[in-house]
Amino acid sequence: MNTQTVLIVDDEFAIRDMLRMALEMANFHCIEAENIQQAYQLIVDERPAILLLDWMLPGGSGLELMHRLKREELTRDMPVIMLTAKTAEDNVIQGLDVGADDYITKPFAPRALIARI
């Protein structure tokens, strides 16, 4: 049984809810944040195994959060998958350059995401 914790960071409740349900069915433990401030606090407090991160968030971008995480020793090795509506090739390259381990565009298939995790 997989009990790894996944932090879902998205400002849209419906996306977080859909991801949480799909991941819990695959035996992941999920925690959620709707902005980068909440996300950073959960990362520090809960130490999730992986981060699913939207690009466009209130209070700052997912890229800003990822850049901060990759600079800090405590969090630099945390795997990050960007989940975003930004589909342009330049956006994909920018997300990967900042430190994303994978980049998935919305809409996406939950089963494919779980396979990538």
For each of these PLM feature ranges, what is it?
Residues 46-52, 57:
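Active-site beta3 strand of CheY-like receiver
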Residues 27-36, 42:
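Short hydrophobic/Thr-rich beta-strand motif most characteristic of the beta2 strand and flanking loop
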Residues 108-117:
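C-terminal output helix
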Residues 12, 55-56, 82, 86:
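The short loop immediately C-terminal to the conserved phospho-acceptor aspartate in CheY-like receiver
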Residues 16, 58, 76, 88, ...:
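The feature encodes the CheY-like receiver
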